[in-house]
């Protein structure tokens, strides 16, 4: 459950290390984002010579949350961190590698690229 001012780790090799959510996209009064939701983020920590710089404002998709994902069969999948993958304006991932597991809930037309790059899909 990600809201405005939440910090997230970056799960790709775009050059950012930590980002902060500044807006949850999808409605004027939408408060929380879960796995698979697109948010607007600002880069708070970045490595030198990366594709993105500190202070840049980008889109991101949430791939892991501490809150977890409830499945239809009643099981709950939780993670140790909140993580996101940075996107460009066309909703394609900026990085070329994904670190850590992602959930099956990302399957769909938009995020199949992230699923194919991920080392593990839960």
From Swiss-Prot:
UniProt-listed SUPFAM superfamilies: Ribosomal protein L14
**Record GO biological process:** translation
Keywords, ordered alphabetically: Ribonucleoprotein, Ribosomal protein, RNA-binding, rRNA-binding
Q: Which domain of life is it from?
A: Bacteria
Pfam families in the record, alphabetically? Ribosomal_L14 (PF00238)
List the Gene Ontology MF annotations in alphabetical order: large ribosomal subunit rRNA binding; structural constituent of ribosome
SMART domains the record matches: Ribosomal_L14
Recorded GO cellular component terms are: cytosolic large ribosomal subunit
Mind telling me which InterPro entries this protein's record contains? Ribosomal_uL14, Ribosomal_uL14_bac-type, Ribosomal_uL14_CS, Ribosomal_uL14_sf
The residues the entry assigns to the signal sequence are none
Subunit architecture:
Part of the 50S ribosomal subunit. Forms a cluster with proteins L3 and L19. In the 70S ribosome, L14 and L19 interact and together make contacts with the 16S rRNA in bridges B5 and B8.
**Protein family (similarity comment):** Belongs to the universal ribosomal protein uL14 family.
Q: What does this protein do?
A: Binds to 23S rRNA. Forms part of two intersubunit bridges in the 70S ribosome.
What name does UniProt use for this protein? Large ribosomal subunit protein uL14
Task: Give the classification, highest ranks.
Answer: Bacteria, Pseudomonadati, Pseudomonadota, Gammaproteobacteria, Cellvibrionales
Report the gene name. Answer: rplN
